[in-house]
Swiss-Prot record:
Keywords: Coiled coil, DNA damage, DNA repair, Nucleus, Phosphoprotein. Residues 108-209 form a coiled coil. GO terms for biological process: DNA damage checkpoint signaling; DNA repair; nucleobase-containing compound metabolic process; regulation of double-strand break repair. This is ATR-interacting protein. The lineage of its organism: Eukaryota, Metazoa, Chordata, Craniata, Vertebrata.
Amino acid sequence: MAGTPAPNSHRKQSGGLEPFPGLSRSIENPPSKRARSFSETTVPDPEDPFGEHAEFTADDLEELDILASQALSQCPVAPRNLSSAHKVRRLDGLPNSPIRKSREDIPVKDNFELEVLQIQYKELKEKLKAMEEEILIKNGEIKILRDSLRQTESVLEEQKRSHFLLEQEKTQALSEKEKEFSRKLQSLQSELQFKDAEMNELRTKSQSNGRTNKPAAPSVSHVSPRKGSSVVLKSEACSPHVGKTTFPTKESFSANTPLFHPCQTEAGHRFLVGQEVSDNKNHSLGGSLMKQDVQQRILADGWMQRKDAQGSILINLLLKQPLVPGSSLGLCHLLSSCPEVPTGTLLQPPGLSTLPGTSGLRTISSSDGPFSPSALREAQNLAFTGLNLVARTESSHDGDMAGRRVFPLHQLPGAVHLLPLVQFFVGLHCQALQDLAPAKKSGVPGDSATHTSCMSSGVEASPEDSIHGLESFSVASLSVLQNLVCHSGAVVCLLLSGMGTEAAAREGNLVQTCADTTSASREDAHDQDQHPLLKMLLQLMASSSAASGHFQASVLGLCLKVLVKLAENASSDLLPRFSCVFPVLPQCLGSALPLPCVLLAVELLSVLLDHDSLAWQLCSHPEGCLLLRLYMYITSRPDRTASETQWLQLEQEVVWLLAKLSVQSPAPAGIGSDCHCNVEAVRALTVMLHRQWLTVRRAGGPRTHQQKQTIRCLRDTVLLLHSLSQKDKLFTVHCVEVLHQYDQVMPGVSMLIRALPDVTDCEEAALDDLCAAETDLEDSEMDCN
């Protein structure tokens, strides 16, 4: 019934809202109080299923409700409401029953429930949107917290790693220091044992000398060492310590030993030497006793000097054994060399008993001349006097140098008396090299005087072996000269003057002589003659740089060290005297030389550039440009035995040398000039900048002192490149050969320097210009292609 509509439903929908006939009649004529019975039989109207005069039953009303609900579900809301309104009017005449009320409340109830559902739907939709927004917010907060947690974990992990590395480095450093301290302790203990044994031996010798030399000569006045009389030492100086069975300490030995006068010591030495030389039957014993007496005298002089004596440091350095690592010779060997004894009994250093150079030392100087035995003996006597004067003289420091040095350089005029001994051995070496040079050219090894003398003495040795032996004495002499130059202002003044060592030794007041030399150098430094020892140094440098070998490199390095210290301690008025060094320096920058020698040559140039007249000689001499040779040595790196740290040190010295050269006014040659070294400077600076940047980038971790110096050198190199780019019009063309390195290094160096806390505006401007020049380089390379 609900699926098929009633027969008259079509009529009701199509014919509009027409009232039922029975219902209208009942409304017009209200029914009687007594209802009709349902048993009355009436003929139903086929068109009216409810009957014409019959009342609606509950089934009819239910059917009407069903029809109305179907009409409401199929028709729009407005027509349904209209039909409902008509139905209400049609049913107004019905009695007030519960069925009628339920029928009237159905549409209102449906509308109300629909509105309630719509309101609830809207509220739920809004709540859903709010929940979605809240979920999105919570998800974002969770993501942010997760990222911050991950970042915090990474930071903590990095801190743990850095802390672990730092602790590991500290532990390693402490272990290395502990090992070093233990090694030093062992070496000091062994040295103390040797000193104890030596003290015991000296004590025994002093007792024996005290017994044999009881008659003492009276003391004499202080005269020149060349005119002093031959006297013996006082017996009190070597008297045995009676009643002392224990080993004496340094303090007790110095306190109980009387203070010698320098002249007495020298005279006593001459007496002992005369006795030993005159005794032809005991040459071997005499040579050994001479060495022991020399060691005893020097050690006693060092212990007996006053605490405030300025020469104590110099004495300790001169008594070091050996003077040079790798060599067995010291000052004692130079002082005890006696060319008059036979070869078998000649005093020789340990391990050099068959050294032909030692016999050459005896036989080369057999005739009269500057290398005669008498000249050696006289030089040794002067050296003894000089040691005594240095140990006891309180010297004043140089006033001119006091303003330039943190620790003023003291005069120590007694140190000048050691120069003849140094000059003897260095000159002997130079003479042997001169004699060997024509023999090498002619191919006849017997032409040299050294070889002839050695063969005549019965020792078969080649000239090369003789030169090798003389080189060891020359190395020891140069070490003595280096110590003298480092601590004596009188030696510095004398070497830079035109006066010879012997002439200076004859002067009464050596300090006044040095002052006169300084004042004369201010007037005309170039017209004075060179000191003979300085000429020998330059000759040794030239010969050693041309040869190859360990001893040649050692001799060249010592010569350069002496010149560096001599230039550092010289006053600005004496620096023009070093103009004689520039013709030899190109040979010291050759590709065959080791890196330490080249580094010393760069240090010497850096000191000499303090004077403007010397700075102009970098590119002016005919042997070649010094800067060009230096650039080629750095870019090629010929010394394969040098470490990376040594190469970085050389590059830093070169950068600082160029920085000093660039700030001089007026600018000398080499920076922005027409010399070919200016073209090579761009390439060399780019290569050095690239290497140093790679070193800093590979290091990582906390920066050490060496890395900080490398960064400082990077900054100076950038400023130098910027200066070259401003002065050189063809800067972009000169950079084409190293364009790949320039493109790689400039962005990294720019980021590194800009990240520093103390970066300057000048450096930032230089980086901007150099990075802008990078694009110009790319354009020029494209044009070349």
